[in-house]
């Protein structure tokens, strides 16, 4: 299986959107649907699903996931981590949609009430320490040992090195897109990512793209679809 760095994944994403012309919102919808597929195929307690969303494209994935779950009749809470007014346009577009669905954002959520947490705070773009307040929240969530599905990359994990950027939310399952990330296979990142599932959401790679690592045999701990 081909592994990529965070920078390589960003290049592939940019190529798909800017050169090929694939709308970002289409990729977000496909990413969200792939997570819904994993939720439906797994044995998760879906009594109360808490979606934690950040301010970037990973957060936009989270908003779309919450909408799809809500439309299917699940008890879902959507909580933003950060000031929504500073969110990317992709997030704001998703917010406009969920408002029309009638899904109201939660100002604050109790982790103890959640039976499943969807981690859509930070994806592969994380390259600095998490803010102190977010580190505290993550440590509290880890302490109560809730089942977590991470979207693309567990929050706090460097997608290239596998290092923890201050604190990291421990995932039962990580649904990552396009290619598996090096950081999800190395160091503590491999442990905190849990079961990694690679989903094809339509990202296109340039024919002359030079990967930093050679293609490897598929690992038994990684599923692809």
From Swiss-Prot:
GO CC annotation: P-body
Alphabetic keyword roster: Isomerase, Metal-binding, NAD, NADP, Nucleotide-binding, Potassium
Transmembrane segments: none
GO biological process: deadenylation-independent decapping of nuclear-transcribed mRNA; P-body assembly
Residue positions binding K(+): 58, 119, 155
Gene Ontology terms, MF aspect: metal ion binding; mRNA binding; NAD(P)HX epimerase activity; nucleotide binding
Record domain YjeF N-terminal: where: 9-209
Cofactor note: Binds 1 potassium ion per subunit.
Superkingdom classification of source: Bacteria
Entry function: Catalyzes the epimerization of the S- and R-forms of NAD(P)HX, a damaged form of NAD(P)H that is a result of enzymatic or heat-dependent hydration. This is a prerequisite for the S-specific NAD(P)H-hydrate dehydratase to allow the repair of both epimers of NAD(P)HX.
PANTHER family cross-referenced by the UniProt entry: ENHANCER OF MRNA-DECAPPING PROTEIN 3 (PTHR13612:SF0)
Protein family according to the UniProt entry: Belongs to the NnrE/AIBP family.
Name recorded for this polypeptide: NAD(P)H-hydrate epimerase
Species: Leuconostoc kimchii (strain IMSNU 11154 / KCTC 2386 / IH25)
UniProt gene name: nnrE
């Amino acid at each position: 299986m081909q592994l990529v760095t965070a920078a390589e994944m960003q290049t592939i994403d940019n190529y798909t959107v800017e050169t090929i012309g694939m709308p970002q919102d289409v990729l977000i919808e496909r990413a969200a649907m792939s997570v819904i597929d994993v939720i439906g195929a797994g044995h998760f307690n879906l009594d109360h699903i808490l979606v934690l969303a950040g301010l970037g494209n990973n957060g936009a994935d989270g908003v779309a996931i919450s909408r799809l779950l809500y439309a299917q009749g699940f008890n879902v809470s959507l909580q933003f981590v950060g000031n929504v007014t500073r969110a990317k346009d992709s997030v704001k577009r998703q917010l406009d949609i969920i408002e029309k669905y009638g899904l109201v954002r939660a100002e604050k959520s109790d982790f103890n009430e959640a039976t499943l947490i969807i981690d859509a705070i930070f994806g592969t773009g994380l390259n600095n320490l998490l803010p102190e307040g977010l580190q505290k929240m993550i440590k509290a969530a880890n302490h109560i040992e809730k089942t977590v599905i991470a979207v693309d990359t567990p929050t706090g994990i460097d997608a290239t090195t596998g290092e923890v950027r201050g604190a990291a939310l421990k995932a039962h399952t990580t649904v990552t897109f396009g290619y598996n990330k090096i950081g999800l296979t190395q160091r503590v990142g491999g442990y905190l990512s849990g079961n990694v599932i690679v989903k094809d959401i339509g990202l296109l790679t340039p024919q002359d793209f030079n990967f930093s690592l050679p293609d490897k045999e598929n690992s038994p701990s990684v599923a692809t679809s």
